[in-house]
């Protein structure tokens, strides 16, 4: 049993995060297919709120998990997981069929919320870089300067800016590296001098 959105997309929940972790749907589909490949007699269930497949061919990948691999996607919430006789008893609700489910599982896999590292806030203070309300670094402009922070000379890539998959992170890192090379190739740099106050 795979459980999606554990601790993410939880507005108003004390310990939850309001944002989508963005990569969980595809990684869960991949691991569900790998599980069915390795153990073909296994029933694999995925409980989800919404399946988000925003990238190229991602929707086809998700449909392949359902149609070719026989992964059971159930729109609903897991209410309780209880260990019993060497198994995990999963109590859940199927929102589309309006029924309660009880599944005996060997394993329950949680797709937990992605959180920024705790050291991000002190680093932002040291670099005078800005952060959003979720403690991710913010870019200077989302369309025009997506890898630059508002602080000159500070560039962003990867999950420091928000949840991203590997290809998006690599593309962003390449863009940040190009910006750094452009900065270092200049004959001279102009910067604002910092003066210590007595």
Model features per residue range: what roles?
Residues 1-198:
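Residues forming the flavin
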């Amino acid at each position: 049993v795979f459980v999606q959105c554990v601790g993410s997309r939880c507005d108003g929940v004390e310990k939850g995060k309001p944002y989508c972790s963005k990569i969980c749907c595809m990684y869960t589909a991949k691991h569900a297919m790998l599980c069915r490949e390795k153990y073909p007699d296994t029933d694999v269930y995925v409980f989800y709120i919404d399946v988000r497949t925003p990238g190229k061919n991602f929707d086809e990948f998700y449909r392949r998990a359902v149609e070719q691999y026989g992964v059971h996607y159930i729109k609903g919430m897991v209410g309780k997981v209880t260990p019993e006789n060497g198994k995990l008893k999963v109590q859940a609700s199927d929102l589309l069929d309006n029924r309660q489910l009880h599944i005996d599982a060997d394993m329950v896999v949680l797709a937990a919320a992605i959180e920024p590292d705790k050291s991000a806030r002190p680093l932002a203070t040291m670099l005078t870089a800005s952060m959003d309300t979720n403690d991710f670094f913010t870019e200077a402009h989302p369309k025009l300067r997506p890898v630059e922070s508002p602080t000159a000379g500070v560039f962003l890539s990867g999950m420091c800016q928000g949840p991203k998959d590997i290809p998006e992170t690599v593309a962003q890192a390449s863009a940040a590296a190009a910006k750094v090379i452009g900065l270092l190739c200049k004959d001279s740099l102009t910067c604002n001098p910092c003066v210590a106050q007595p």
